[in-house]
Structure formats: C-alpha cells, structure tokens
C-alpha cells in the first residue's frame, strides 16, 4: 500500500486515539502507565483507497493484549458463516476457561453461554473467560485454537503475528505489529460485514449485570463504529478504531500508547 505523507487528518486522528486510549484503557492506573514509558507504534489507513496515511514503528513487534480478541472473533465469524454454529449455539465453560484472570464475566465451570453473548462479552467487557470458552469449544483446546488463529493471520497477510491464547493475557511469545492489527481489522470489516456491527455494541447485559464497552471513542468521537481496546503492563495501551466522517473512512491502530 502506498504511503501518503503530510496527511494532517491522519496525524490528528492518531493524537486523538492516543489520548482516548490513555484515558480509557482496561482497568489500568495512570501510575502504572507512567512507570513504563514507551514509544507508541501506530498506523492509519484510508479504507477507501488502501493508502497508508501515517505509520510510526508500524512493523515493530509488540504485545497485542486484548486486540487478540479481534482474531478470536474473526475465527468465530468464519464458523458462523460456514453454518457450523449459530448465534444461539451454547458454549460450555470448562475449568480452564472459568479460571482465566480478569477482565471476565465470572463464568462458572459447567455453565453455558450463547455464541452471541460470548461475542458481545469480548467486545464490551473484554472477557477473558468468554474468549477461552470460545477457543475450547471451537478448537478443542485453547492451544489448538491459537494455532488456528496464527494460521488464519498468515492467510490474510499478518506476517509478524503469533498467537498463543485467545484472550491476549500475557505471554511473551504472543506478538504482533500495528500493521498486522490493521490488516486484521480491515479484514473483519470487509470479510464479515454481517457480523462486524457487534463491535458497535456500547452496552451488554448478561445475567442481570450491565457492561459498558471499554472503547471510549464509541461514546465521544463522532463516526466511530468500533473496534477494540487492550491493555497489559507489558503492552501498554492498545486500540484499533474505525471511523467514518462524510465520505471518509479511516482505520487506525495504536500499540503501546
């Protein structure tokens, strides 16, 4: 994809993203952020032309954190489109899934959750127990599912990404780049338009509890239609975002903001 330089709109978008990421990441304190300084990796793509409007350290390996769940959902959408499951298919929670670290829904071993609810749980609460439940029910084990995720990434052009789990919880071998995450986000938009709108979900109610999407852009930046936030201490604040303004459609990824 060609790089267009001097794209002021793209740079402004990155700055907005960086600010929103810093204020709205998943259960992370400003103190912990200040103690782990890093240079953010970023990329902005014009979705109408495929041109790269801005790129900084876009090929540098980073930890994806919960942006991992975009690939978990990409694989899930493939199962839905193939008719192997439906939105109402019930997934069974295993002890492994129930034991995942926060953030989570608090699913109990032996409980069941519908595919549609699991998908919304990933998008809003970034629920690690729901991610592991998807992985084990579709892949037999989370390890097997992670291999499918990596192989799927290679197929769509993610040349520097390796997945070891379905949630994005810390694993030194689970790496990606801003470019690869932009490729994944673009494929989610183009390949699964019938399912992509799940990323617009602002609120999700499950078992009587209401969850608010961690992506503050959905609430405060006009034209945002998704997609995902992520945070670990090792990764810093991560965000992939898709925004429509008039006839413009920009896709941006910031890793380590």
Spans of model-derived segments:
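Contiguous hydrophobic segments
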Residues: 22, 136-137, 144-149, 194, ...
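Bacterial N-terminal signal peptides
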Residues: 10-20
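Domain-terminus/edge residues, biased toward the C-terminal soluble/receptor-binding domains
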Residues: 158-162, 170-257
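Active-site-adjacent loops and short helices of periplasmic peptidoglycan-processing enzymes
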Residues: 25-179, 189
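Structured C-terminal helix/loop/strand segments within mature extracytoplasmic catalytic/sensor domains
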Residues: 2-8, 22-33, 39-41, 48-54, ...
């Amino acid at each position: 994809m060609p790089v267009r330089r001097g794209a002021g709109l793209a740079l402004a978008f990155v700055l907005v993203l960086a600010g929103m990421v810093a204020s709205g990441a998943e259960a992370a304190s400003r103190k912990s952020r200040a103690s782990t300084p890093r240079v953010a990796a970023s990329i902005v793509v014009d979705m109408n032309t495929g041109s790269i409007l801005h790129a900084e350290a876009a090929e540098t390996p980073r930890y994806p954190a919960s942006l991992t769940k975009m690939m978990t959902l990409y694989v899930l959408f493939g199962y839905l489109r193939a008719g192997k499951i439906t939105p109402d298919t019930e997934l069974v929670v295993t002890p492994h899934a129930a034991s995942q670290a926060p953030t989570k829904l608090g699913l109990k071993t032996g409980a069941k959750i519908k595919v549609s609810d699991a998908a919304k749980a990933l998008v809003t609460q970034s629920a690690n127990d729901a991610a592991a439940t998807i992985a084990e029910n579709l892949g037999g084990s989370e390890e097997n599912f992670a291999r499918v995720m990596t192989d799927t990434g290679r197929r769509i052009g993610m040349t520097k990404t390796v997945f070891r789990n379905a949630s994005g919880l810390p694993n030194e071998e689970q790496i990606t780049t801003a470019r690869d995450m932009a490729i994944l986000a673009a494929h989610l938009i183009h390949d699964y338009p019938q399912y992509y709108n799940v990323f617009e979900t602002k609120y999700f109610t499950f078992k009587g509890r209401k969850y608010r999407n961690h992506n503050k852009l959905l609430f405060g930046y006009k034209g945002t239609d998704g997609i995902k936030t992520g945070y670990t201490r090792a990764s810093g604040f991560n965000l992939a975002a898709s925004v429509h303004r008039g006839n413009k459609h920009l896709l941006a990824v910031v890793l380590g903001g």
